[in-house]
């Protein structure tokens, strides 16, 4: 149908090629074209075609010959499947299957690699209410090492969600009535657990994580209660946020920066007993932080990809236009560091950088040093956010723990205080914190020193101490320091509490994971405390210390040292049987198996008890065993076991103390420290996991299996499925391979909205569901709140079927190829899917399913059975029913984490308390350097001279923008210059004199450039832009015109510091060389060589492939330079005083280039270098000052009242042969399409040929003619736009989000017409006649698919800020532009020292004889001739070639 875009038509034809009935499949988006829009007699006419000589435009002349030899385009999605021999992304190369590790086990491996001493735990209250999605408590990657709390099984939880979302209608199942009062819940929400384990109120403040928890907390908190009442004091607010036992007077507060791998802006609060730091950093999981091209190191070479850093995922793509097809995704949640590599040679600057995760290291290469640093900084920000607990940074340093305050000179531009503090009362590890002050630094240092020196607790701590002999319940006064501690340390009655790890003191050896050592505990009676209690208000459970491999339990988060730590009683049904510890606890080795589902899984084993599977899989067993004393576990220490697996059976299972037989102990403390705290999964290679469905198996698993552990390592129970014991390794492999080959589907939870009778499938048990969900997240680098709902085996149909697996979650439709040579992945957001349609398969016996995607061609999948295809369609449609009406700004893609609500409220309350206390609000440097995008971590600590404040030059610059052409060529520069004025620079626009009033109206300096744009437009329309006929006429008639343009441009650019030129001006690059200033290019159409798009002046109606596209740039540049080189070189010698130049010497391809169109309209090609930047449109908004005529407003109101669509028609100031015929065609088409038209009749007769006796065509009441109106105001009122396709006009109509019809006339208009049609947001009008034009008008005003695509594209373009991106690019690339400035040799001066320059630069009239070969070789052999004379021989050869070339005419050069 005409209503479908070209890509959709192509796919539809493929899908229906083998249909026997010959009919096209039904599409909800298809249009029934009315009969009146059939082609009429004028269907082949074109009223805009030139009369008389039918000249061929460039895209029909020489490039037609090139096209015949060009390679056919291969831009199909199949290009994503090529085997990359140089890529190192093969998941099979990993040493340990990463997907089998739970969150804390991954963190354990992370700590092993980096010694990131992050010991504070975190938890999430996963309770879901009213269908809102919340991460389940057990799914948190940092909780699985914690004591177990009972969590309701997913089956029980699922019962609450059934029937909540009734699918009202479906093409597969009959509708069912919705229960009264039931509201549909979003499909992305997992089933709410029936009864979540809840921590006692005294165990911590439930505040930070989880929106529902935050709401309840604020409702019962004093802060929330005081929102509408009297202001709460700052001291009270700090007590609440930092969880002090009592309110403490705030001595002072200072804005400061925490210095770690980054500079983090926040506030320091000094109270009576604490030094506190607070900073708010929302985790933005959906914001795109940075995009660009990088080269990724593979096995044998570097491969260039398009990278997108979104949230905490770094994804890279082979094709930037196919963002649904990532090459791979790197999850930065488990990243450790990012850093630029050291240069191999001193003095060089390295453009490579590495990103280290807990399992591998990725190496990337940027195009420039600045780009590499920016990528590293952006990734470091993400790593910092993911390593910090919660959405705010909180640090509480007890003053009695502080050893000293020192002034540091680590930063040159700020005063920095180094605080050395004892971390905890067990290891007495010393940490260092650096706080930088841009203002009041000395005041802060003085106050800190006074507080430390005069504090009574600190003074008391300076007295000699004795070895500790404190009992468990001993009071503070009797608490002594450890014997392992320094000889003189303060009383440690409270630990440092922080949500992130500090900088470790260089002279203090912190225990490392790589050592697998247990931190010694010298006091057998002292309770095992958390090393650092997190103050993240939502995390009430604390994970055990990873660095020490010791157990810790959840304690009251109050710093009171005398209170007993409260334990949590185990909930029934949460623990599975585990392999008990060895009887000899003195030789117990605490090992963290990578196959365990709980990272806190502890197994005691020696060499005799290690199973074969464990020996094969565990590298830690080859290390020296760590012996732990039994005293390390005090009798007073209780351990509560918290399972991360929510799918365990609810059958009660006791936990046993070490050395106790399971059948002889009548009363076992479930919190005994001897109880193992994890379960082993043989899928990962070695431990045993037993299902709880059989009491006999429970007894077997509970009995000590020291002598049978080798056999137990290979066995597991699958009683629910098979009832027999099978070999885990071999069976797991067999199940995977046989399941993949057999195909099928699996569902992991009950489909919401379906009654029991509607369930057409068998659901997997909860154990397999959890494992499948973990694998799903691992494959696609999703966050832990993404829950897998269903999976299907199917083939992605392309040129050849690509067999793989479909994964469906609440928010994504994903596909992963299972073919050995393919790495194809698809990540398709559900919100981008319009519909799913059942189709016939391409192959006999297969059943097809077409996924209709918004703004993209359909994806076609083939299933082995019809029922599998139908179930997949049902699953997708059910999710679409719940998500189709969600707006982007209301969904989770708004950029701010939904869990940030509580932290944001906490931050706002603290800000209010600070204002209420009349804090000094003087603006300081820390606020000035805040990032433009409201980034809460604006700066990365780096070279302060190179990276401070976005590379902005210290002095204002005179920036000249040089361009020629029409109004559309000048308008973008006005928008750019207005922003440059705001930056403090002095911009100037050099263009035609007729635009001077318009430019000066905006306060911009102006310089005139000669040349009549109307004459230029005439030959462009008549001959085509830069065709051979165009060049011929321009060469014969416009030699004087070109001389005038060059000379006037030279005068207009005097005094410039930076030159920005449109390449069509032809003179700017030479002027910049003469002035020795940085030179930038900027244009509205592709001008840089690429295989992705043809040259904007060489667009054909049919795509010809990358070979044709690339050669169009070479051919155009060659023809263009050949035509003007003689005249340009004469002008260079005459006025600029420069020698002759050539294409290679100009180095145009190395110059920084700014493209002022949107990357959503023209995605940056893969082969463009980093200094070529697509910035976005430079819009000049004038709607605020425009007052529309009353009759125009009345016309539009009447059209809306009549229910008619409004269409804008205007072709600018195009000159055509017969304007009356065009006007008549527009009138007839508008009437035939039954729309209302706002007409801007700018077209006119060709110059000096207007016939005054020719009457104007009368306009009917359905058409309202205007002279002019700002596009940014007018297009918002329209339903569609028809215009000539200029870059600025196209950008304005697309930004308004309306379908666009383009009738191109010359130049880049053909390029943008093709882009609009390719994107499916408009129509490329090849001819203008009533039949074609009226049909196009009806289509753009009635095709819902096109309307929706245009609206979505408009939303994306409106989010761009092209002028700001352009300015930042200018700042960033200024050094590169300066590096390309060369000292030129004047004609009357000595030859340049540059060897390359000496070869070709000679005078025209200079006659030099060619020497014989021996005359050159002899001095070389004897090294007796001067080097300059040696170059003379080469100089003569070069002069002869150049001299011969100059004698040829441009036409003969072209013919040759």
Swiss-Prot record:
Residue ranges of domain GRAM in the record: 236-283, 774-840
Membrane topology of this protein: Peripheral membrane protein
Family named by the database record: Belongs to the glycosyltransferase 28 family.
Gene that encodes it: ATG26
EC number: 2.4.1.-, 2.4.1.173
Binding, UDP-alpha-D-glucose: 966-967, 969, 1269, 1271, 1284, 1287-1289, 1308-1309
Record's compositionally biased regions (Basic residues): 13-22
Function: Sterol glycosyltransferase responsible for the glycosylation of ergosterol to form ergosterol-glucoside.
GO molecular function, one term: sterol 3-beta-glucosyltransferase activity
Highest taxon of the lineage: Eukaryota
Protein name: Sterol 3-beta-glucosyltransferase
Signal peptide: none
Start-end of Low complexity biased regions: 510-523
């Amino acid at each position: 149908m005409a209503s479908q875009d070209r890509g959709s038509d192509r796919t539809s034809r493929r899908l229906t090629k083998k249909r026997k009935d010959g009919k096209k499949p039904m599409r909800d988006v298809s249009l029934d074209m009315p009969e009146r829009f059939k082609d009429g007699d004028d269907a082949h006419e074109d009223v805009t075609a030139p009369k008389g000589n039918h000249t061929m435009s460039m895209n029909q002349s020489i490039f037609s010959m090139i096209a015949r030899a060009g390679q056919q385009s291969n831009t199909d999605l199949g290009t994503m499947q090529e085997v990359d021999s140089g890529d190192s992304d093969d998941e099979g190369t990993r040493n340990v299957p990463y997907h089998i590790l739970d969150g804390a086990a991954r963190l354990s491996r992370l700590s092993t690699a980096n010694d990131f001493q992050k010991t504070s735990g975190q938890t999430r209250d996963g309770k879901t209410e009213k269908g809102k999605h919340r991460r389940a408590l057990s799914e948190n990657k940092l909780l699985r090492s914690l004591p177990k709390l009972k969590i309701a099984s997913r089956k029980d939880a699922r019962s609450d969600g059934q029937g909540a979302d009734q699918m009202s209608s479906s093409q597969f199942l009959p509708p069912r009535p919705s229960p009264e009062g039931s509201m549909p819940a979003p499909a992305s929400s997992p089933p709410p657990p029936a009864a979540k384990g809840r921590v006692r109120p005294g165990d911590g403040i439930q505040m930070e994580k989880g929106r529902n928890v935050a709401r309840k907390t604020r409702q019962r908190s004093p802060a929330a209660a005081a929102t509408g009442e009297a202001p709460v004091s700052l001291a009270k607010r700090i007590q609440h946020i930092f969880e002090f036992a009592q309110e403490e007077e705030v001595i002072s507060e200072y804005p400061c920066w925490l210095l770690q791998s980054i500079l983090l802006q926040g506030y320091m609060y000094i109270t009576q007993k604490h030094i506190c730091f607070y900073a708010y950093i929302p985790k933005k999981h959906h914001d795109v932080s940075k995009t660009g091209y990088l080269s990724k190191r593979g096995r044998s070479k570097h491969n260039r990809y398009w990278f997108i850093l979104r949230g905490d995922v770094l994804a890279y793509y082979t094709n930037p236009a196919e963002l649904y097809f990532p090459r791979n995704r790197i999850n930065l949640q488990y990243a450790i560091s990012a850093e630029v590599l050291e240069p191999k040679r001193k003095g060089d600057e390295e453009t490579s950088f590495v990103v280290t995760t807990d399992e591998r290291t990725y190496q990337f290469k940027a195009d420039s040093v600045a780009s590499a640093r920016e990528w590293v900084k952006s990734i470091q920000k993400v790593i910092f956010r993911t390593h910090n607990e919660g959405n705010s940074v909180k640090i509480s340093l007890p003053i009695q723990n502080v050893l000293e305050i020192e002034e540091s000179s680590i930063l040159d531009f700020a005063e920095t205080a180094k605080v050395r503090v004892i971390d905890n009362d067990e290891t007495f590890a010393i940490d260092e914190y650096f706080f930088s002050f841009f203002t009041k630094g000395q005041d802060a240092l003085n106050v800190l020193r006074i507080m430390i020196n005069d504090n009574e607790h600190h003074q008391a701590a300076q007295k000699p101490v004795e070895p500790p002999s404190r009992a468990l319940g001993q009071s503070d006064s009797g608490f002594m320091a450890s014997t392992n501690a320094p000889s003189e340390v303060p009383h440690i009655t409270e630990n440092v509490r922080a949500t992130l790890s500090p900088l470790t003191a260089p002279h203090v050896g912190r225990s490392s994971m790589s050592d697998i050592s247990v931190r010694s505990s010298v006091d057998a009676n002292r309770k095992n405390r958390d090393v650092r209690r997190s103050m993240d208000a939502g995390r009430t459970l604390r994970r055990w210390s990873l660095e020490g491999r010791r157990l810790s339990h959840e304690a009251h988060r109050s710093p009171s040292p005398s209170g007993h730590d409260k334990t949590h009683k185990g909930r029934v049904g949460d623990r599975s049987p585990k392999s008990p510890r060895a009887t000899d606890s003195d030789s117990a080795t605490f090992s963290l198996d990578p196959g365990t589902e709980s990272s806190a899984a502890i197994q005691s084993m020696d060499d005799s008890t290690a199973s074969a599977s464990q020996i094969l899989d565990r590298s830690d067993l080859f290390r020296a065993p760590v012996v732990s004393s039994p005293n390390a576990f005090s009798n007073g220490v209780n351990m509560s076991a918290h399972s991360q697996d929510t799918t365990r059976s609810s059958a009660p299972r006791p936990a046993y103390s070490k050395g106790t037989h399971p059948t002889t102990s009548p009363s076992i403390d479930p919190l005994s420290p001897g109880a193992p705290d994890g379960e082993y999964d043989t899928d990962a290679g070695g431990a045993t996991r037993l299902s709880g469905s059989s009491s006999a198996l429970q007894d077997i698993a509970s009995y000590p299996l020291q002598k049978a552990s080798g056999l137990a390592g290979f066995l597991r129970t699958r009683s629910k499925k098979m009832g027999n014991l099978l070999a885990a390794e071999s069976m797991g492999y067999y199940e995977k391979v046989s399941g993949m080959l057999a195909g099928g589907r699996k569902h992991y939870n009950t489909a919401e909205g379906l009654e029991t009778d509607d369930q057409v499938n068998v659901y997997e048990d909860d154990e397999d569901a959890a494992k499948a969900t973990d694998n799903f997240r691992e494959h696609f680098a999703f966050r832990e709140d993404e829950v897998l709902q269903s999976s299907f085996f199917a083939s992605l149909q392309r040129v050849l079927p690509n067999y793989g697996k479909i994964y469906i979650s609440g928010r994504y439709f994903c596909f992963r190829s299972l073919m050995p040579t393919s790495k194809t992945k698809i990540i398709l957001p559900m919100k981008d899917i319009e519909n799913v349609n059942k189709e016939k398969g391409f192959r006999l016996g297969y059943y097809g399913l077409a996924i209709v995607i918004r703004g993209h061609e359909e994806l076609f999948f083939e299933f082995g059975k019809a029922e599998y295809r139908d179930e997949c369609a049902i699953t997708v449609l059910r999710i679409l029913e719940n998500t189709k009406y969600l707006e982007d700004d209301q969904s989770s893609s708004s950029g701010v984490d939904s869990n940030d609500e509580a932290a944001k409220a906490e931050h706002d309350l603290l800000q209010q308390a600070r204002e209420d206390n009349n804090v000094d609000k003087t603006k300081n440097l820390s606020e000035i350097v805040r990032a433009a995008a409201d980034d809460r971590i604006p700066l990365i600590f780096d070279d302060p001279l190179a990276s401070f404040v976005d590379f902005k030059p210290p002095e204002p610059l005179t920036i000249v923008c040089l361009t020629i052409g029409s109004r559309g060529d000048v308008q973008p520069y006005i928008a750019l210059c207005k922003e440059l004025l705001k930056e403090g620079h002095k911009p100037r626009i050099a263009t035609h004199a007729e635009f001077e009033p318009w430019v000066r109206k905006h306060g911009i300096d102006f310089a005139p450039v000669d040349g009549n744009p109307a004459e230029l437009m005439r030959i462009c329309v008549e001959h085509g832009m830069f065709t051979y006929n165009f060049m011929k006429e321009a060469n014969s008639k416009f030699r004087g015109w070109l001389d005038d343009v060059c000379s006037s441009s030279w005068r207009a650019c005097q005094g410039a510091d930076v030159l920005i030129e449109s390449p069509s001006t032809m003179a700017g690059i030479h002027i910049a060389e003469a002035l020795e200033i940085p030179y930038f290019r900027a244009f509205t159409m592709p001008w840089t060589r690429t295989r992705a798009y043809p040259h904007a002046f060489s667009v054909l109606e049919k795509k010809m492939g990358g070979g044709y596209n690339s050669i169009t740039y070479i051919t155009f540049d060659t023809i263009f330079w050949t035509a003007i080189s003689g005249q340009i070189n004469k002008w260079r010698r005459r006025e600029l005083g420069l020698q002759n130049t050539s294409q290679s010497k100009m180095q145009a391809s190395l110059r920084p280039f700014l493209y002022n169109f949107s990357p959503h309209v023209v995605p940056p090609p893969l082969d463009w270098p980093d200094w070529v930047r697509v910035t976005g449109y430079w819009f000049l908004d004038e709607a605020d000052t425009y007052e529309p005529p009353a009759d125009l407003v009345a016309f539009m109101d009447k059209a809306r009242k009549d229910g008619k669509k409004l269409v804008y028609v205007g072709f600018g100031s195009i000159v055509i042969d017969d304007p009356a015929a065009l006007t008549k065609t527009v009138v007839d088409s508008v009437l035939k399409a039954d729309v209302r038209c706002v007409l801007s009749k700018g077209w006119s007769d060709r110059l000096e040929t207007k016939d005054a006796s020719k009457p104007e065509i009368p306009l009917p009441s359905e058409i309202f003619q205007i002279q002019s109106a700002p596009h940014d105001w007018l297009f918002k009122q329209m339903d569609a736009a028809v215009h000539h396709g200029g870059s600025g006009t196209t950008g304005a109509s697309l930004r308004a989000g309306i379908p666009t019809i383009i009738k191109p006339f010359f130049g880049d208009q053909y390029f943008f017409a093709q882009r609009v049609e390719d994107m499916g947001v408009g129509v490329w009008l090849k001819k203008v006649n009533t039949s074609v034009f009226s049909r196009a008008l009806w289509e753009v005003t009635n095709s819902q698919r096109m309307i929706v695509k245009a609206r979505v594209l408009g939303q994306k373009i409106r989010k761009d800020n092209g002028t700001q991106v352009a300015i930042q690019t200018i700042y960033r690339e200024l050094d590169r532009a300066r590096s390309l400035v060369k000292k030129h040799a004047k004609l009357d001066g000595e030859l340049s020292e540059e060897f390359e320059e000496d070869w070709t630069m000679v005078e025209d009239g200079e006659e030099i004889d060619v020497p014989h070969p021996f005359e050159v070789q002899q001095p070389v052999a004897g090294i007796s001739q001067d080097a300059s004379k040696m170059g003379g021989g080469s100089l003569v050869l070069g002069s002869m070639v150049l001299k011969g070339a100059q004698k040829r005419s441009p036409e003969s050069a072209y013919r040759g």
